Regions:
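Core SAM-dependent methyltransferase catalytic element
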Residues: 107-127
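Conserved SAM-binding loop
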Residues: 9-10
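A short, conserved alpha-helix within the catalytic core of class I
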Residues: 45-59
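Conserved beta-strand signature within the Rossmann-like core of class I S-adenosyl-L-methionine
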Residues: 61-73
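Conserved SAM/SAH-binding beta-strand->alpha-helix loop
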Residues: 2-4
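Acceptor-substrate binding/catalytic loop of class I
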Residues: 75-91, 111-113
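A short acidic, Gly/Pro-enriched loop at the edge of an enzyme's catalytic core
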Residues: 28-39
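Short alpha-helix
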Residues: 83-104, 119-120
Length: 127
């Protein structure tokens, strides 16, 4: 996220009386603290090596919301073209197999720039 997006998030959270910790960080270097977050949201950033740290960073009962492009996105005009940054069928669910799956979807949805092939997961860390 950009610094501007983080500031907007903080302003909205303040107006709603919510406690939000929004961080601008390079995820190549940032170390997620263990059992800290009630909610982790990840959209269109795929770094497979973060799966374990994400699970450990969730508090017991914490939620993960994750969406990323799949290899089927290659047929559309935008999104990553490097297959290393695209999920394979069933991969997202497998990456977070230690969590309780609440919702899982793989397919094509309408995005703001046209169709996009995604895998989506909402999962919960067991108490």
């Amino acid at each position: 996220m950009s610094t501007a997006a983080i500031e907007l998030c903080r302003e909205k959270a303040d107006r709603l009386g919510l406690a939000v910790e929004a961080i601008v960080a390079d995820l190549q270097d940032y170390r997620l603290p263990a059992e800290t977050y009630d909610l982790i949201i990840n959209f269109h950033y795929l770094q497979r090596s973060l799966a374990g740290p994400i699970v450990r960073a969730l508090k017991r009962g914490g939620l993960l919301v994750f969406e990323s492009f799949t290899v089927d996105q290659l047929q559309y005009s935008y999104g990553p073209k490097d297959p290393a940054f695209l999920l394979h069928p069933g991969e997202l669910r497998e990456m977070f197999a230690g969590l309780e799956t609440l919702l899982h979807f793989e397919g094509v949805i309408e995005g703001d720039r046209g169709p996009k092939a995604v895998a989506q997961l909402i999962a919960k860390r067991r108490p």
